[in-house]
Amino acid sequence: MMKVLAVLFVGVLGCLKGYAEKTPLISLKVEQLTSGKKHHFFGYIGQCQTIPWNASGRYVLGLEIDRIDRMPNPDEASTVFVIDTGQNNKIVRLDKTHAWNPQQGTMFYWNPLKAETQFFFNDRDVKTGKVFTVLYDLEKKKRVHEYRYDDSPIGNGGVAADGSAFLGINYGRLARLRLVTGYPEALDWSRDEIAPKNDGIFIVDIKTGKKRLLVSYRQLDEALKQRNPEIKHRGLFINHTLLNRKSDRAYFFVRGGWSGTKGDKINMPCSIHTDGSGLTLHDKHIGGHPEWAEGNLLIGRQGDNQIFYDVDKKKVVGQLGTPEMFPKPEGDISLSPNADLFVNGYKKNNNNYYAIYRRSDSAFVRSKGF
């Protein structure tokens, strides 16, 4: 089955049946961007500004692969390309990567400091298995920097909105403990320990390349055991390292007991300041794919509602839209860089739907099923 990239173009139209007459409707235009025998996709869901478009909107990032119905083989590269919308959606193939998976792609991020021409993606040395992050310049058509660390070969897990840093994680550990979010045969330097003190979330200065360990698995293990001394696991891993819009706090999940491993199943939401202070474990779980709004607010789920959760107060402080608008509030959600357009993507009867809400005037639309 052919896989294509498509985009939704957003505009404004009249009134929406079933809602208040004063509520404007957002119109959608769907345009197919790619075709052919290969699969084309961007990767992640748009959380925390993982955006396909460059600053001007002319170029759209993507990956080209042969198979999307399984995890890639270790020697199976994906082609990095951009779609040039100014040249009749021409595909411009740029590079290749051996660090990708069907769920998250290769963690594309446009560089916030040069969002017109530079972007990040992950790669892996096929000989050593070491993962690293690439900064690529579209104008120069080459890699302008590679963030390689022999002692802790990490890949990008989230770029700060101010372009100052990115969060790095051990994708080899993910390949072992949560395969669908890892890279097959990526080196896992901490595999011999269930809660190593030399692994966890790293923060990397984009300008200098200097890295430091923000929080270790050992710290997280100790924090978990302070809450429950009886907890047992065969190894912790971290998913969804999400930097807030001020670039001074991260929200993430520490997990264990997934993918058939023995022990207690752990799924603990955590937050920490980027200076390493304020590590907090949160009792309130607001869904597996939350999104940062303004300040210290996260968008997530409580029951049937799309809600705002205050990380400082550790409680729900508001609601976004209605259950009628967002029937699956734990769907894949994203908030635009200006924090105005909110999108909830969800599945129903084997079709994907996208509910789009504009916060400034409550305009709303739901896409057809794909």
Label for each model-derived stretch:
Residues 32-78, 241:
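Beta-strand-rich domains and repeat architectures in extracellular enzymes and scaffolds
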Residues 31-42, 93-102, 149-151, 211-233, ...:
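Surface-exposed loop and turn segments in beta-propeller and other repeat-based domains
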